[in-house]
């Protein structure tokens, strides 16, 4: 029996030791669970609270404890007893409640407790220093049992809070370091944008940038020789607000604006071709085709000199887009080649926005208004077509009507070769062709016909009846002249009389312009055709004679 009793006592003792060991489990999870919420509650008595000068110190705490015990001993002689309390230890700190009323007497947070001291003379007494700077207090407490478990719980609480705080700070530091790394990375990118090495445009100092159309895209890139790997590329995002658009490109010399056309000083200078758009000089003013497709349809021969389309020759599509379509205009600069584009360009069939002059009004609508020197045909000949100079007109040099009629018949027979829809082909233009004299006689006679009234069977779509060319009764009729149409030629005697009456007019035309084409004589206000002074169709045989000075004298 004794042995069984001893075994039972041993089991109970071991169970108590196990329970104590379980109470001594001070893992982090256990401590968190222990101090969570209200925490651990202990029964005690409040010895007293004393103000101290410092936040910590064993000597300081021991002196304060002895002082408070002396006060309690004096009160006990008077019959007063210590206040019974219970205190709780939690994450919120130390709370002291009145045992009788349960009211909260004192609350000291963990961060306010600066020092914990144990009484070496009494194992049930301990104290702690708390308060803020300049207001420190020492609280002395006497526990119902040993004060060591309370002190250990306070130590564990402070250690746990310290570790949790340290871990939180490490996490915050790690997150902050990560943010700092991102900020540093972003700062590096921003500094690279401000760095002149990584500018979009890099120019050498003191040199103007060379704009090459083929390598223009390569200019606006970061130089590959100074480009770092991947990370330091110029970002595609918007620049920083502190960096303006000009600061982004650095000190850049702005190239001159070569695309804007210069402002014309005078109306005459507006149509002078620039160095990049100079038209090739050609003696063949009207080009390979007598008239541009967009200006005058095929088969039409207008009265007077037909103005070619201003943009008949289109060397480049870009030139037409920049300058825009203009109505037919001819400019003659002093001492320069007449500016007119009669040649068909790369795109002769392009529809022009401005309608041509020949199709807007009847051919004779403005004939009576051309009273003084219209000179449209002479403007297109210029100094580059030096034909035979017409001498002064006089009665001795003018041929008689009898010699003029055979020439008219021969010219009419020559003109019959051109009754077709398109004019005859012209030899290819060469730079050494000085004038129309290099072409065939038939081709020259075809152009001499421009501005002269035609027969109705000449594929002319104009209404001949609208031309105010009334035949004048001849004062000296000739019996040998064949019957000629009235619109083609008036009476030779009337023309001779008109020349004889006003010889100064011909001299002005001959001295001022020296042009082989005198189409203004066909556009006189009275409608008479002063073409009896020479052959209007030229010499068929191609040999000059005294009577036929110029192949275009009458046209």
UniProtKB/Swiss-Prot annotation:
Predominant localisation class: cytoplasm
Family annotation (SMART domains): PTB
CDD domains the record matches: PTB_Dab
UniProt KW Phosphoprotein keyword: yes
Region (Disordered): 1-26, 384-410, 418-437, 468-555
Localization (cell): Cytoplasm
Listed Acidic residues bias regions: 504-513
Record field: compositional bias (Low complexity): 470-479, 487-501
Domain PID, residue spans: 36-189
GO annotations of cellular component type: cytoplasm; intracellular membrane-bounded organelle
Keyword Ubl conjugation: yes
Source superkingdom: Eukaryota
Molecular-function annotations in GO: signaling adaptor activity
Residues carrying Phosphoserine: 491
Post-translational modification: Phosphorylated by FYN on Tyr-198 and Tyr-220 upon reelin induction in embryonic neurons. Also phosphorylated on Ser-491 independently of reelin signaling.
Segments of skewed composition (Basic and acidic residues): 15-26
Subunit and partners: Associates with the SH2 domains of SRC, FYN and ABL. Interacts (phosphorylated on tyrosine residues) with CRK and CRKL (via respective SH2 domain). Interacts with DAB2IP, SIAH1, LRP8 and VLDLR. Interacts with LRP1. Interacts with APLP1 (via NPXY motif). Interacts with DAB2IP. Interacts with ZSWIM8.
UniProt comment concerning the protein's domains: The PID domain specifically binds to the Asn-Pro-Xaa-Tyr(P) motif found in many tyrosine-phosphorylated proteins.
Protein name, as recorded: Disabled homolog 1
């Amino acid at each position: 029996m004794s042995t069984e009793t001893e075994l039972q006592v041993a089991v109970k003792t071991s169970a108590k030791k196990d329970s104590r060991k379980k109470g001594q489990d001070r893992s982090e999870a256990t401590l968190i669970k222990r101090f969570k919420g209200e925490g651990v509650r202990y029964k005690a008595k409040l010895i007293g609270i004393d103000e101290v000068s410092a936040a910590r110190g064993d000597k300081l705490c021991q002196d304060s404890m002895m002082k408070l015990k002396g006060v309690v001993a004096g009160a006990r002689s008077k019959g007063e007893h210590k206040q019974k309390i219970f205190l709780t230890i939690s994450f919120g700190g130390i709370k002291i409640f009145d045992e009788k009323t349960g009211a909260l007497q004192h609350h000291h947070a963990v961060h306010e407790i600066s020092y914990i001291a144990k009484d070496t003379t009494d194992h049930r007494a301990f104290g702690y220093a708390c308060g803020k700077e300049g207001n420190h207090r020492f609280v002395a407490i006497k526990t119902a049992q040993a004060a060591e478990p309370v002190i250990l719980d306070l130590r564990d609480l402070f250690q746990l809070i310290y570790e949790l705080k340290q871990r939180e700070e490490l996490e915050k530091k790690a997150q902050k370091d990560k943010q700092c790394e991102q900020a540093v990375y972003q700062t590096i990118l921003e500094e690279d944008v401000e760095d002149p090495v990584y500018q979009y445009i890099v120019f050498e100092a003191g040199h103007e940038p060379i704009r090459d159309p083929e390598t223009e895209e390569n200019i606006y890139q970061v130089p590959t020789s100074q480009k770092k790997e991947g990370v330091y590329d110029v970002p595609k995002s918007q620049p920083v607000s502190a960096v303006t658009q000009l600061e982004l490109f650095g000190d850049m010399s702005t190239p001159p604006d070569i695309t804007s056309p210069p402002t014309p000083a005078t109306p005459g200078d507006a149509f002078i071709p620039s160095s990049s758009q100079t038209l090739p000089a050609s003696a063949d003013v009207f080009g390979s085709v007598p008239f541009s497709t967009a200006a005058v349809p095929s088969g039409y021969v207008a009265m007077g000199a037909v103005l070619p389309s201003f943009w008949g020759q289109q060397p480049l599509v870009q030139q037409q887009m920049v300058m825009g379509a203009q109505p037919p205009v001819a400019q003659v600069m002093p001492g320069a080649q007449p500016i007119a584009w009669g040649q068909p360009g790369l795109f002769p069939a392009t529809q022009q926005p401005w309608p041509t002059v020949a199709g807007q009004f009847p051919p004779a609508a403005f004939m009576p208004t051309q009273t003084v020197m219209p000179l449209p045909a002479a403007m297109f000949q210029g100094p580059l077509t030096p034909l035979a100079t017409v001498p002064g007109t006089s009665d001795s040099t003018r041929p008689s009507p009898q010699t003029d009629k055979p020439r008219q018949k021969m010219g009419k027979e020559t003109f019959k070769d051109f009754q077709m829809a398109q004019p005859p082909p012209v030899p290819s233009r060469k730079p050494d062709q000085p004038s129309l004299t290099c072409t065939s006689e038939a081709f020259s006679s075809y152009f001499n016909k421009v501005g002269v009234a035609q027969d109705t069977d000449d594929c002319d779509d104009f209404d001949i009846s609208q031309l105010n060319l009334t035949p004048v009764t001849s004062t000296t009729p000739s019996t040998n002249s064949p019957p000629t149409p009235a619109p083609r030629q008036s009476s030779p005697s009337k023309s001779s009389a008109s020349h004889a009456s006003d010889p100064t007019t011909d001299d002005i035309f001959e001295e001022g312009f020296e042009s082989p084409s005198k189409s203004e004589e066909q556009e006189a206000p009275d409608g008479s055709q002063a073409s009896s002074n020479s052959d209007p169709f030229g010499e068929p045989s191609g040999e000059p004679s005294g009577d036929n000075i110029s192949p275009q004298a009458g046209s």
